[in-house]
A protein has these predicted regions:
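Intrinsic-disorder/low-complexity coil detector
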Residues: 12, 77, 139-141, 164
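Hydrophobic transmembrane signal anchors and adjacent membrane-proximal interface regions, especially
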Residues: 69, 84, 150, 160-161
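Charge-rich interaction segments
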Residues: 125-159
Length: 172
């Protein structure tokens, strides 16, 4: 999240996809960090459209969608779920998990193409259903303590060393 400003928001995007559902556990702490990222992006200068993507562990269906979904509903943000689209195909045996992921977590090229098709289907559906101009977003109060929204990234390379190393004298 701390890299969002330099790596994403400085590019002034008008559309952002946020996907963190597999690397996070389904806990209050990760819901709070996720909300911080969502708020940082959603309230940034360009006020981009935001789509939340919930990926999944393809061996067991686990993800943080339960907690992250609470954030999506609180901010009325659209979300797409691989747990309800791709994972059932894996469970049913119509897709072999090794065809789409080498480690049940990170998609390979075929897995990325499949995830992209789910996202594209959703975006095409939204485009068809709602071509009206959107009003300015209303930012509700945070759902969590939200201690991460204003987080920043410090790099050690920019620190200046201001003290001399100490010398330990050995006393015998």
């Amino acid at each position: 999240m701390a890299r969002a400003e330099a790596d994403l928001l400085s590019k002034e995007p008008d559309f952002v996809i946020i996907e963190f559902s597999v690397n996070d556990d389904s806990t209050e702490h990760f819901m709070e960090t996720y909300e911080g990222l969502v708020r940082k992006v959603y309230t940034s200068k360009t006020k981009p459209a935001v789509l939340l993507v919930h990926n999944v562990f393809y061996n067991n269906g686990a993800n943080a969608q339960l907690m992250h979904g609470r954030i999506a509903r609180h901010y009325n943000l659209p979300a797409v779920s691989m747990q309800s689209t791709i994972y059932p195909e894996v469970v049913a045996g119509r897709i072999e998990n090794r065809e789409i992921t080498p480690d049940d977590l990170h998609p390979n090229d075929a897995g990325h193409a499949l995830v992209a098709s789910v996202i594209t289907y959703f975006l095409d559906k939204v485009k068809t259903e709602d071509a009206t101009e959107q009003s300015e977003p209303d930012y509700p109060t945070p759902l969590t303590k939200n201690t991460y929204e204003k987080s920043i990234r410090h790099q050690n390379l920019s620190l200046i060393h201001i003290s001399e190393p100490t010398r330990l004298d050995v006393i015998s």
